[in-house]
Each structure stands twice: as C-alpha cells, then as structure tokens.
Amino acid sequence: VGSGSGTDALICARLVGPRGRVYALDLTPGMRAKLEANAAAAGLANVEVLAGEAESIPLADASVDAVTTNGVLNLVPDKARALAEIFRVLKPGGRLQIADIALARQVAKRYRQDPQMWAECVVGAVEEERYLDMMRKVGFENVERLRELDYFALSSSDRTREVARLFNAHSVALRAAKPLTATAAAPVPLGRAVLDFG
C-alpha cells in the first residue's frame, strides 16, 4: 500500500518468485509509471500496479497473504478505514507489516500548516499507541511493536529535527495478523472513522 516507485514491491516480487504475485497500490500516476518501468527493467513480470487509495483497495476480500506499508499511513487521512481495508483484503492468517512515523503526542496546530512538516511526514503521524489500538479495533491479533528508529536525526532541516524532538517523532515497525477465523473487518464506529487532529 503506497508503493511509490517500487522499492519494497520489487523486493517482495523477488522474494515470492515467479509463481507469486505482488500487487503494488499507489495513488499517484507518476509513481505508478516509475514502478512499472522499474519492474520491467528488473525483469519482474509478477508485479501488478494498481491505482487507488489506502481507504479503498481495489482487490477482492481475502485475496492476499501479506500487506506491507512503508511511510504511508502518516499521509492517509482516514487511517482506521485504511487498516480496515487492509484487514478486508488479507486472507485469514495473513500478515500486516507497517513501518511508519509515530509520535509521543499530537503535533500542535501551528505546525500542521507547514508543507515541510508534511513532506517530512511529521504532522500526519499519530501516537504509536493509537496505531496499535486501531489495528486491534479492526480485528488484527498478535499486534506488536518490533523496533524504533530515530528517522529524523539525519534530516537536513534544523526545524524538522526540532519539531520531531518536540513531539518525539520516530520511525516504528509494527506487525499483526488477521485471525485464522476472521471473515471481515470489524465495523469502524461512526465518529471514529476519521481521526481528528484538531
């Protein structure tokens, strides 16, 4: 989900081999075109590039074994809906792997208007526990935090590093599984489907 030019998708395509299939979903036509070119250049015919959003994945229910998303959820407006969609397309027993930006507390309103903060993935992120809670609420089990990384330490922007420190923004790796007995995502309660960053 949010495949961009395809780094993760191409690695997955090599891992699953020619008998496996990788669906690479991205919203941006330019990124999809780059991914198609990169897959062709790598000789990987098992990558299918899909147009769409994380909140409405154009795949059938219970159709994939695993979903990865790397640095994307922080940019998705309705994170709970995106997680419910991921749950829907996973087969029972399927795995979710997330690498994204998490916070210790919400970003102050004055920073949310700064394009640099959006570009650096700070202002769209939520608290780590909220990610974990959303994953559990849609039905995932074995939800766990794997590791943390100080992603912003190498930012070229002093202001970004300052804001990241202020809100303890960091990269986190999470994983979860769809229960073997699962059939559909738990409904997202009205009023909680869209996260309020106000």
Briefly describe each language-model feature range.
Residues A80-R95:
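A short glycine-rich, Lys/Arg-flanked "PGG" loop and its adjoining helix->strand segment in the class I
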Residues V138-G198:
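C-terminal lobe and adjacent flexible extensions of AdoMet/dcAdoMet transferase-like proteins
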Residues V16-G17, V76-P77, L90-P92:
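Helix-to-beta-strand junctions that scaffold the AdoMet/dcAdoMet cofactor pocket
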